[in-house]
Design a protein with these regions (language model features):
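Short acidic-glycine-tyrosine-enriched beta hairpin
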Residues: 81-98
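Short hydrophobic/aromatic-rich beta-strand segments that constitute the beta-sheet cores
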Residues: 57, 76-78, 112
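A short hydrophobic beta-strand segment most commonly corresponding to one strand
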Residues: 42, 94, 108-126
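A short beta-loop-beta micro-motif enriched in histidine and acidic residues
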Residues: 35-44, 51-68, 80-81
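Asparagine-centered strand-capping/turn motif at beta-strand->loop junctions
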Residues: 104-105
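A short, N-terminal "cap"/entry segment at the start of jelly-roll beta-barrel domains
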Residues: 1-42, 57, 123-133
Length: 133
């Protein structure tokens, strides 16, 4: 964990100072709202908008990860074992350290909110080239 930090409360506008994350295959998008680039140390927060038929690239993190399905539906798929779990509006899911997964949108698309705890700095160094591999 990072060293000493001042205890402060900050309001973060999700439309300002975020980082586009090149993790979506399709017409949707993913943005980091709370990430190391704006001072996050203990957790990250991402908004992932997947349109119908979109999916994320295969993902894995050096930290635990939790997401909430704000709207829509889809599937979370384990890459290593091929397991799949349906996701509906209001669902939450946890990804363990090092587990590989992919999120796939259903026919209405889906919006997710979540991220890693603690922050996984390597995640923000992904390039479009690395994601396409």
């Amino acid at each position: 964990m990072p060293g000493k930090h001042h205890e402060t409360v900050r309001v973060i506008d999700s439309k300002v100072g975020g980082k586009l994350l090149p993790i979506v295959f399709g017409t949707g998008s993913a943005h980091a709202v709370l990430w190391p680039g704006n001072g996050a140390h203990y957790r990250s927060l991402h908004l992932i908008d997947l349109h119908p038929g979109d999916r994320t690239c295969d993902l894995s993190h050096a930290s635990e990860c939790i997401y909430y399905v704000e709207r829509g539906s889809g599937t979370i798929r384990g890459i290593d074992d091929g397991t799949a779990q349906d996701l509906v509006e209001g669902a939450m899911f946890h990804i363990g350290v090092g587990d590989a997964y992919r999120i796939e949108a259903g026919p209405q698309g889906m919006r997710l909110i979540g991220g890693t705890v603690p922050v996984d700095p390597a995640f923000y160094e992904l390039s479009q080239f690395e994601v396409a591999r």
